[in-house]
Swiss-Prot record:
Job of this protein: Protein-lysine methyltransferase.
GO MF annotation, one: protein methyltransferase activity
Annotated region described as Disordered, given as residue ranges: 1-20
Binding of S-adenosyl-L-methionine, residues: 69, 97-99, 118, 149, 170
GO annotation (BP), single: methylation
Annotated protein name in UniProt: Protein-lysine methyltransferase METTL21E
Basic and acidic residues bias locations: 9-18
Species, as recorded: Mus musculus
Keyword field contains Methyltransferase: yes
Length: 244
């Protein structure tokens, strides 16, 4: 099917927003990576340009995790524009709360070995999106696995076999009752050398409280901020690392 789309060019180096004008410019560039197809198809989808590929994402209407949220676009943009600093090639990566799979797809296209995880009711659409966008395009075929935060972690993700270089997360903190379980999951999946890259949109006081609790277990660094979106991008590693 021939779809007319606009391909986006971008800078090779990324600059942190310094003021409102810079913030708006970078945010506009990030948001321009998405597009709506010009033809109506039987299965509606939204398009994105990352890692040199057109990515087609099917969203849902029944739950929060079935949409592509701005935090996911911010994290995808960061991974692409920081590919040298945070090299994904052959790295072991897990995404928690993968939702539609966009972040996992981009990490896979950048060369990572990816496990995309979410709740069981989201896995069908997640698998569909990942398969259609990574087959014959990626060095490593991504896996899709169920992960309910805080549930059966030792059985499904035993610490002895967790060897993740990166944990990716976008918009996993919001008004849900599982923040303690989310923190437990971050802690369980992390080893001393694991890097967490986490994009977060601040909406309510709950987000600030979670960050405070997160800091009790992890060294947290704000590496980028997008005030017009109320989104911050964090890098984190476990506290009290022997290598620190």
């Amino acid at each position: 099917m021939d779809l007319t789309v606009t391909h986006i060019t971008h800078k090779e180096t990324y600059k942190e927003p310094r003021d409102d004008d810079d913030d708006k410019q970078v945010v506009a560039e990030i948001m321009a990576r998405s597009f709506i197809p010009t033809l109506i198809t039987t299965i509606p989808w939204e398009g994105f340009h990352f890692a040199g590929h057109e990515i087609q994402i099917t969203e849902g209407k029944d739950c929060y995790g079935a949409f592509v949220w701005p935090s996911a676009l911010v994290l995808c943009y960061f991974l692409e524009t920081h590919a040298k600093q945070y090299n994904m090639v052959d790295k072991n990566v897990i995404e928690i709360g993968a939702g539609t799979g966009l972040v996992s797809i981009v990490a896979s296209l950048l060369g990572a070995r990816v496990i995309a995880t979410d709740l069981p009711e989201l896995l069908g659409n997640l698998q569909y999106n990942i398969s259609r966008n990574t087959k014959m395009k990626c060095k490593h075929l991504p896996q899709v696995k169920e992960l309910s935060w805080g549930v059966a972690l030792d059985r499904n993700f035993p610490r002895s076999s967790n060897n993740f270089d990166y944990i990716l997360a976008a918009d996993v903190v919001y008004a849900h009752p599982f923040l303690e379980e989310l923190l437990m999951t971050f802690d369980h999946l992390c080893k001393e050398t694991t890097i967490i890259l986490w994009a977060m949109r601040f909406r309510l006081e709950k987000e600030n409280k979670f960050v405070d609790k997160f800091k009790e277990l992890f060294d947290l660094e704000e590496i980028s901020s997008f005030p017009s979106l109320n989104i911050k991008l964090y890098k984190a590693m476990k506290k009290n690392r022997r290598s620190a």
